[in-house]
Amino acid sequence: MSNPTLTPRDVARELARRYSTMTHDELDILESVLVPMKFAKGDKILAEGDVCKHIYWVVKGLVRQYYFKNGKELTEYMATENTIFMSIESLFKEEPSKQMIHALEPTVIYALPKKELEAVAIRCVNIQMLYRKILEESLIISQRHADMLRFESALDRYRKLVKSNPQLVLRAPLVYIASYLQMTPETLSRVRTAALVEKE
């Protein structure tokens, strides 16, 4: 599902299919809180110091979530089509984000404003379930990435990324892939060569 002309109804249906079965009325309510957004390549979606107020669903495009440490940019996450992203700590603490998010390609997003989503979740059990499953998924993805960085070799990290998100490997700049996998561009180059040799 990467059609940039998708309607809010289409997106509501896809979210329901992925996270929680919904009645027709619940789909109407979920559709009503969805906010369409478009970003050009290079646009900031969330700036450092802004408070994250939305959960985002990528319809089309590629986004990068990153932060600065000791003056160096570090990529924490990248999202392609049919993927949720957010600055989760900022979203829940309602504090300025230490992370930044920007579009690496022309990007179409539907946003779920946290306050509106929580308001409708109070009265709609299936939307409450959707909200909980989205948050669970986000935390699990973060934990798996942290475990991969702790326990996997550079080659295994790259193999896992190729298997789990081949589109990301094809579309994201190599410098960001290297940062996401916590290796230098030179190490990534060697790892990519080793992975190609394995296929032959």
Task: Go through each PLM region and give its residues.
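Short beta-strand segments in beta-sandwich/barrel cores
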Residues: V35, L62-Y67, I84, V108-I109
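Short phosphate-coordinating micro-motif centered on Lys-Gly-acidic
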Residues: I45-D50
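Glycine- and acidic-residue-biased ligand/ion/polar-headgroup-sensing regions
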Residues: G42, K53-R64, E81-N82
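Phosphate-/nucleic-acid-contacting segments
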Residues: E152-E200
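Cyclic-nucleotide recognition modules
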Residues: L74-R132
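Cyclic nucleotide-binding regulatory module and flanking cytosolic helices
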Residues: M1-V35
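Short, Lys/Arg-enriched N-terminal segment that forms or immediately precedes the first helix
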Residues: V11-A12, S138-D147
